[in-house]
Amino acid sequence: MSEPNPKAFPLADAALTQQILDIVQQATHLRQLKKGANEATKTLNRGISEFIIMAADAEPIEILLHLPLLCEDKNVPYIFVPSKVALGRACGVSRPVISASVTSNDASQLKDQIIQMKDKIERLLI
């Protein structure tokens, strides 16, 4: 695999990537996940996004670089994972996914895990 794009900041390490993809997989089963850059943008605009995951190997990376700006405006944490193929698998689809949004649901059993993950991502953004 090639070097990740330097514009992809903050990039999750291997352990954090695994945790993120686990949460993404669980969120998929609970219908708390939106896949793709367009749907991620919609969740941000509607204010229902908990955090945004983007693939660092998106080609060209510029197709999702509007998301970090929007995330900062809306105060939503965001993170890059190394592989769009792995993100696609975690999302439960057979195609690569370059961006995903975990959405909020107060009654969800994922709530505690989502809060912990948001804290970890926010620490990387400092």
From Swiss-Prot:
<keyword id="KW-0690">Ribosome biogenesis</keyword>
<comment type="similarity">
    <text>Belongs to the eukaryotic ribosomal protein eL8 family.</text>
</comment>
<dbReference type="InterPro" id="IPR029064">
    <property type="entry name" value="Ribosomal_eL30-like_sf"/>
</dbReference>
<dbReference type="GO" id="GO:0003723">
    <property type="term" value="F:RNA binding"/>
</dbReference>
<keyword id="KW-0694">RNA-binding</keyword>
<dbReference type="GO" id="GO:0030490">
    <property type="term" value="P:maturation of SSU-rRNA"/>
</dbReference>
<dbReference type="GO" id="GO:0046540">
    <property type="term" value="C:U4/U6 x U5 tri-snRNP complex"/>
</dbReference>
<keyword id="KW-0698">rRNA processing</keyword>
<comment type="subunit">
    <text>Component of the U3 snoRNP particle. Binds to the C'/D and B/C motifs in U3 snoRNA. Component of the 25S U4/U6.U5 tri-snRNP particle, a subcomplex of the spliceosome. Binds to the 5' stem-loop of U4 snRNA.</text>
</comment>
<dbReference type="GO" id="GO:0005730">
    <property type="term" value="C:nucleolus"/>
</dbReference>
<dbReference type="GO" id="GO:0000398">
    <property type="term" value="P:mRNA splicing, via spliceosome"/>
</dbReference>
<dbReference type="GO" id="GO:0000494">
    <property type="term" value="P:box C/D sno(s)RNA 3'-end processing"/>
</dbReference>
<dbReference type="GO" id="GO:0071011">
    <property type="term" value="C:precatalytic spliceosome"/>
</dbReference>
<dbReference type="InterPro" id="IPR018492">
    <property type="entry name" value="Ribosomal_eL8/Nhp2"/>
</dbReference>
<dbReference type="GO" id="GO:0030621">
    <property type="term" value="F:U4 snRNA binding"/>
</dbReference>
<dbReference type="InterPro" id="IPR004038">
    <property type="entry name" value="Ribosomal_eL8/eL30/eS12/Gad45"/>
</dbReference>
<keyword id="KW-0507">mRNA processing</keyword>
<keyword id="KW-0687">Ribonucleoprotein</keyword>
<dbReference type="GO" id="GO:0000462">
    <property type="term" value="P:maturation of SSU-rRNA from tricistronic rRNA transcript (SSU-rRNA, 5.8S rRNA, LSU-rRNA)"/>
</dbReference>
<protein>
    <recommendedName>
        <fullName>13 kDa ribonucleoprotein-associated protein</fullName>
    </recommendedName>
</protein>
<dbReference type="GO" id="GO:0032040">
    <property type="term" value="C:small-subunit processome"/>
</dbReference>
<keyword id="KW-0539">Nucleus</keyword>
<comment type="function">
    <text>Common component of the spliceosome and rRNA processing machinery. In association with the spliceosomal U4/U6.U5 tri-snRNP particle, required for splicing of pre-mRNA. In association with box C/D snoRNPs, required for processing of pre-ribosomal RNA (rRNA) and site-specific 2'-O-methylation of substrate RNAs. Essential for the accumulation and stability of U4 snRNA, U6 snRNA, and box C/D snoRNAs.</text>
</comment>
<dbReference type="InterPro" id="IPR002415">
    <property type="entry name" value="H/ACA_rnp_Nhp2-like"/>
</dbReference>
<dbReference type="InterPro" id="IPR004037">
    <property type="entry name" value="Ribosomal_eL8-like_CS"/>
</dbReference>
<dbReference type="GO" id="GO:0000452">
    <property type="term" value="P:snoRNA guided rRNA 2'-O-methylation"/>
</dbReference>
<dbReference type="InterPro" id="IPR050257">
    <property type="entry name" value="eL8/uL1-like"/>
</dbReference>
<dbReference type="GO" id="GO:0034511">
    <property type="term" value="F:U3 snoRNA binding"/>
</dbReference>
<keyword id="KW-0747">Spliceosome</keyword>
<dbReference type="Pfam" id="PF01248">
    <property type="entry name" value="Ribosomal_L7Ae"/>
</dbReference>
<keyword id="KW-0508">mRNA splicing</keyword>
<dbReference type="GO" id="GO:0031428">
    <property type="term" value="C:box C/D methylation guide snoRNP complex"/>
</dbReference>
